[in-house]
């Protein structure tokens, strides 16, 4: 794969954020590129890394033909981890998903783990290892996207994955999903740190307007979230920046070493919260001993602009408003946010009709890092008590 080399970067403490890199050519063999402004990641190295990367697909009541396309596009070497929060009664959409996965496995013999987010055996495993952050007042796992991603991470850790990538299940273009996973691998191969995150910036996010396709560059929420994440950095460096373009990147990946030390917020705030936490904790040289290896190696964040556009399910204006509120709430409540920044966020949310005059954004609910969870014990409990766990080739 040929990509623009990461020339410009923003350094914030131990955190390096690379400017967005465009994919120039999807598939290459030779390692020799005479131009220093281009990075070449040979096909063989990408395919070697894919075998060490689990791809996590959280889903909830998605269209089955979209799920089918997404699964078929994930490179065969990658273990697939599906965490579903779909209905199990009236109608039982989860059963339909299970039937689809079984058929997909029979055709492909892909490596797959599947589980339902509301599985009582899964909740029991969290309870017994003392990790109750993910549970609701009834002792069941909450319904948020962040919770599903965290379950997927633990399953990935249990099977020994060194890298984890996330893809949404509602993508209309299967070929785009195939590219996303290879983009993740390319990002990891460019990194010099074991604590690396790769976030994707869609080349276009097309919308149907007046009967034709309009290839929009920015999503509605992303534009605003990125603006405030950049302000968060700028107000501490005193230099204006536009480096961050992937604040709401649902399609992102990280090394397991980074994933297991990050706390995760719930629901749709999870992607911007990852960035906010990394900047808060590793953007200053404080309490270095707790994470000495992280500070020694540094955290690298790569942003890659995809070759493919991103078509996904339109979930309506209310979904957009909820995403915007939860995304900006993570920045509003950050320890790095200044009074001036908070005032601007409040004004924006009120101007969009999302908050009333005297309301504040809700404080994000945060779940502890998974590093201290005894993974073998947790997995043994899941396997012994789950009613929905399916394992194929894993």
UniProtKB/Swiss-Prot annotation:
Gene Ontology molecular function: any one: mannosyl-3-phosphoglycerate synthase activity
Gene Ontology CC entries for this record: cytoplasm
Pathway note: Carbohydrate biosynthesis; 2-(alpha-D-mannosyl)-D-glycerate biosynthesis; 2-(alpha-D-mannosyl)-D-glycerate from GDP-alpha-D-mannose (MPG route): step 1/2
Entry's EC annotation: 2.4.1.217
Subcellular location(s) of the protein: Cytoplasm
Catalytic activity: (2R)-3-phosphoglycerate + GDP-alpha-D-mannose = 2-O-(alpha-D-mannosyl)-3-phosphoglycerate + GDP + H(+)
Pfam families: Osmo_MPGsynth
Cofactor: Mg(2+)
TM region(s), chain numbering: none
Superkingdom per UniProt: Archaea
GO biological process: mannosylglycerate biosynthetic process
Similarity-based family: Belongs to the glycosyltransferase 2 family.
Record's function text: Transfers a mannosyl group from GDP-mannose to phosphoglycerate to form mannosyl-3-phosphoglycerate (MPG). The enzyme is absolutely specific for GDP-mannose and 3-phosphoglycerate, and transfers the mannosyl group with retention of configuration.
NCBIfam families, per database record: osmo_MPGsynth (TIGR02460)
This protein's name: Mannosyl-3-phosphoglycerate synthase
Organism of derivation: Pyrococcus horikoshii (strain ATCC 700860 / DSM 12428 / JCM 9974 / NBRC 100139 / OT-3)
Gene that this sequence comes from: mngA
């Amino acid at each position: 794969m040929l990509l623009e080399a990461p020339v410009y970067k923003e350094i914030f403490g131990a955190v390096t954020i690379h400017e967005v890199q465009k994919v120039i050519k999807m598939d290459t063999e030779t390692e020799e590129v005479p131009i220093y402004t281009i990075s070449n990641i040979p096909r063989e190295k990408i395919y070697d890394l894919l075998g060490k990367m689990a791809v996590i697909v959280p889903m909830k009541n998605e269209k089955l033909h979209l799920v089918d396309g997404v699964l078929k596009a994930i490179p065969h070497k990658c273990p697939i981890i599906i965490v579903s929060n779909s209905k199990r009664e009236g109608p039982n959409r989860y059963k339909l998903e299970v039937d689809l996965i079984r058929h997909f496995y029979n055709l492909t013999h892909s490596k797959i783990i599947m589980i339902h987010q509301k599985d009582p055996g899964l909740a029991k495993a969290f309870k017994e290892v003392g990790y109750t952050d993910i549970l609701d007042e009834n002792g069941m796992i909450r319904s948020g996207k962040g919770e599903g991603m965290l379950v997927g991470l633990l399953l990935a850790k249990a099977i020994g994955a060194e890298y984890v990538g996330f893809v949404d299940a509602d993508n209309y273009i299967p070929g785009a999903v195939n590219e996303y996973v290879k983009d993740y691998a390319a990002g990891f191969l460019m990194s010099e740190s074991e604590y690396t995150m790769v976030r994707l910036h869609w080349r276009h996010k097309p919308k149907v307007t007046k009967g034709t396709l309009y290839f929009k560059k920015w999503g509605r929420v992303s534009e605003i979230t990125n603006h405030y994440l950049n302000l968060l950095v700028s107000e501490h460096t005193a230099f204006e920046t536009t480096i961050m373009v992937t604040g709401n990147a649902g399609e992102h990946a990280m090394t397991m070493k980074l994933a297991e030390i990050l706390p995760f917020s719930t629901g749709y705030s999870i992607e911007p919260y990852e960035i906010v936490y990394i900047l808060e904790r590793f953007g200053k040289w404080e309490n270095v001993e707790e994470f000495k290896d992280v500070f020694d190696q540094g955290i690298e964040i790569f942003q890659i602009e995809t070759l493919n556009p991103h078509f996904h399910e339109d979930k309506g204006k209310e979904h957009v408003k909820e995403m915007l509120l939860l995304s900006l709430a993570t920045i509003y409540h950050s320890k790095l946010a200044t009074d001036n920044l908070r005032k601007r966020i409040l004004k924006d949310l009120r101007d969009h009709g999302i908050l009333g005059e005297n309301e504040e954004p809700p404080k994000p609910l945060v779940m502890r890092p998974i590093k201290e969870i005894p993974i073998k014990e947790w997995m043994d409990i899941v396997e012994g008590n789950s009613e929905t766990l399916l394992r194929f080739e894993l």
